[in-house]
Structures are given as C-alpha cells and as structure tokens.
Amino acid sequence: MSDTNNTNSSDKVLFCSFCGKSQYEVKKLIASPSVFICDECIDLCTDIIQEEINKLPREDSDDSLPTPHQIRKNLDQYVIGQDHAKKTLAVAVYNHYKRLQYLPKPKKEKLDKDGKPVEGSDKKESKLPAKAMVDDVELAKSNILLIGPTGSGKTLLAQTLARMLDVPFVMADATTLTEAGYVGEDVENIIQKLLQACDYNVEKAQRGIVYIDEIDKISRKSDNPSITRDVSGEGVQQALLKLVEGTMASVPPQGGRKHPNQDFLQVDTTNILFICGGAFDGLEKVIQQRTAKTGIGFNATVPGKDDRGVSDLLIEVEPEDLIKFGLIPELIGRLPVVATLAQLDEEALIQILTEPKNALVKQYQALLTMEGSELEVRREALSAIAKKAIARKTGARGLRSILEGSLMDVMYDLPSLKNVQKVIIDESSIADGGKPLLVYKQKVDHADLSKKA
C-alpha cells in the first residue's frame, strides 16, 4: 500500500501490491491486513495455476485401463452385431493405450526466477517423438482400418470407443482434404480440430483418437501415372503418411489470427490413434477376381457364379487388394490392423431399432412421452422398416428416415391433440404408407389421421 498524500487520511490512494496499479486503474482492489491485490492479478494467477495443473502428467494404473472383454461389452451396449470388428478393435485399442503407459514421463523444464527456461537445457531432445520401451523393446503403434458397407456401424464404433476411454476424439472427412497449398483443408487441420476438442491441452491431444471417414474416396483414380497432379487423391495419401506414422505437427495456437506473433504449438502425433474407415464400394469385385479359380488348357475351370456375399468376400481382403483398389502401399503399411464389418441383415436392423441404449424406437418413444402419449411399434412394422432399409441399401442410416416419415403427420398434429393416449405403427403404416393408429384417452377408439378433417 502506498500513500501519495500523508496530510489527510481521506486522500489516500491504494495501490496493488503485485502490479503497482492504483485503485483508479483497475476494476476491483481486494484488501488484506497488509497488502492489496487487483482483479487483473487474480485472473493472471488463476491462469498460471490452471496451466501448471494441465502440465501435470496423468497417472495411469492398470485398473484404469479396461480389458478387451470390458471394451467389447461396452461396445455391445451401443452397436449390434459386428463381432469380428468389435474383437479386433478391442484388442488394438487395449494394446495401444497399454503401450502409452510405458512412455517416458516428460522431464520438468528448469525455469529461472522470471519463469523463463534456463539456458543450457537441451531443447532438441524434448521435440523428439516419445517412444514406448519395455525391456529395451520399442512398442510401435498399430493404427486401424475399418472396411464395411455404408451404415454398418464404422463411425459409431469409433465414437463409442472414444466416449468409453474418455479421450479427445475428432472426426475428419477425407473428401475435403487436399495437398497443402490447394483449395481445401490441409491434413494438419485434423490435429487442430483435435486440439479444439480438448481446449488446446496438448498433453490430452497427444493421447486422442482421430477417425478419418471416407478414406476410400481418396484412392488413386487409375493405376497409370497421370500428367496432372492428383491433389485430392494420391496427394492426400502422401500427406497423411507422416501424420499417421508419427511426426511433430505445427498447429497455430488458439486465436491464431488475433495473435499472429505467437509461436506455433508442437503436437506429437506418434501416440495418437488413427482409425480410418470407408465403404470401399467395389472392393469385393477385386477380391473375387483374385480368389477365382483359374487354369490353363484342359485344367481351366469355367468361372461359375460366386454365391458369396459382400461380407464373406471382405473378410478375405489382402493388402494387394487395397493397392489395386487405389491406396498406396505406404499408407496400407501404416494401417496394420484391418477390421471388416458385415452387411446388416433384417434381424440385425430390427435389433438396432429396439435393443441399444439409444435405440431409435426408444428415442421416438421419449419424444411422444413429452406430449403425454405412448408409442407402440409392432413387430410386423419393425420387419417392414428393416426390409425397406435393405432395399434402399443405406444400412442402419436409413432406419431413421423411414420411421420419421411414418410419424411425420402424427408429430405435426399431436401437440394440438391433447387426448391421444397411444400411437400405434403397424405394417401398413410402413409398407403401404398408411397413417398410424391413434388411441384416445376418453374412449378406446381407433382412428387414423385421415378421419380428422
């Protein structure tokens, strides 16, 4: 506390004991028995403490990491079927995060009294990617490639894994990526989105999961080299190589345009788990050609009709099939774990409608409960919804649009009808486009919306 005028106690001007600003230069000045602190210094101290907390390494124990059986059990609650893919993902994710427990703990940087790094400390060593070592054996990272038809659950599997492990998760669309310098998103933007997902906490981001969807859409257009540059196909694959394998990516800090003089954030992608997914439409034909029996002369066999389905063929996928499809060998080598998803049949689609925690029927039942009504979807209607989704070849994604279409008129009129007790969807509501049946509270009277005029 300073006193600018000692003649009169009422003329005393109070100063912050930390920054020296007067009470007229700050919004608030908090007093203690002997010192004062302003609101600006309080905010600064809060930020410093929060940064120190974020820098503390997270202590992982064996109990905190779920076993493959536990991971599989959690996936079963949200994803129906796909047993082979679940088992493959559970083992790969468990091994990946088990590997992270053996990473060397970061050394604390020596700072002087002003909070600046002490000269002479080895800065180059801190920028090298951290490697997991067990008994002098380096544990390499195993990224994952998901192959399956559209609507089979690839994205949902990745989202459920990230939610269970409580790690930063980001989805990227490969179709929007281009080489650096061209119109579109650079591959480094993926890491920037991951940082945004964890509030720019670099330590958390370096343990996150990145899901790159539609990876099959950046395949090479042809096997023959072209004169023109393929900036959205093979060029993107080349740009993804170092990012997927592990490199120090330079990402602009939060509010980069507002603070152009700030240094770029260095993010080590060595320990980020990359999951790439795609439908790979037409890959089954490549596999079919490779596995077809051939011969010469009298030993030649007439190729008959292959009765194997898409799911059976995709299980037999080999790296050479992916290369022929259009992925470059270097990228395939960096995605060693390949999990194939089966095409969903009618019974699986019915289970998806009713069994998971966030099943579609349960969601619409909750919506109608808000209006004071119940929703009943009969077994025949569930079967009709599944058959229509199979005919549209949209997989589980098509279920919502079909159910939404059948309930559109009901959800439009229901807020105005206060005496509806139950809404019933039967087979005719789906197959023939009929109106759902309404059961009123006053008397049991089945009436459809067409009678309301």
Swiss-Prot record:
Gene3D superfamilies assigned: 1.10.8.60, ClpX chaperone, C4-type zinc finger domain, P-loop containing nucleotide triphosphate hydrolases
Gene Ontology BP, a term: proteolysis involved in protein catabolic process
Keyword entries, A-Z: ATP-binding, Chaperone, Metal-binding, Nucleotide-binding, Zinc
Binding site for Zn(2+): C16, C19, C38, C41
Segments of this protein annotated with the region Disordered: 108-127
Family from the record: Belongs to the ClpX chaperone family.
Protein name: ATP-dependent Clp protease ATP-binding subunit ClpX
Gene, per the UniProt record: clpX
